[in-house]
Amino acid sequence: MTTTIKSLKSYKTPLRYPGGKSRACKKMEPYIPDLRDYEVYYEPFLGGGSVALHITKKYPKLKIVVNDLYEPLYNFWLQLQVNGDYVHSELQQLKSKFSDHSSARELFEDSKLKLYDIDVTGKDRAVYFYIINKCSFSGLTESSSFSPQASDANFSMRGIDKLPVYSKLIEDWYITLSLIHI
């Protein structure tokens, strides 16, 4: 990876996520144990991925196992990992094509319809999930509505163009969709 660990500070999460920890990681740092002697880090509730990304950047050799029960979220992370170039390219094209509020709202509504469509590929569903996440009021998916302000501020080329770095960061993650039994 040509991006250095120091330059990765701005890479907190590619998603907006309710209850996310992107701003809290710095404050939580003193309470996170030194993981240099550990073999695996388990993240049972991945969500926006802020903590797992923080751990990945701090301990790049540590095996990371992440999990979430929300299938569209799981699918987004998995597709970003295995089809990141496709997700990035599709989002660039869609952002260019649907750049004004009216067309962005149309894209948002269409994405909500296709998110659970069984005829849509996993990688396209990941694209739709990202659009919904970035264009909604609170980052919620199906239960939220379109926000012109969120569409302008969050569904941006700048954010889309960071996705390949996230894809590289998570390339060795083991991503699961299951109940965790302890």
What residue ranges belong to the model's regions?
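SAM cofactor-binding core of SAM-dependent methyltransferases
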Residues: 39-106
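SAM-dependent nucleic-acid methyltransferase catalytic core
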Residues: 2-27, 31-35, 80-180
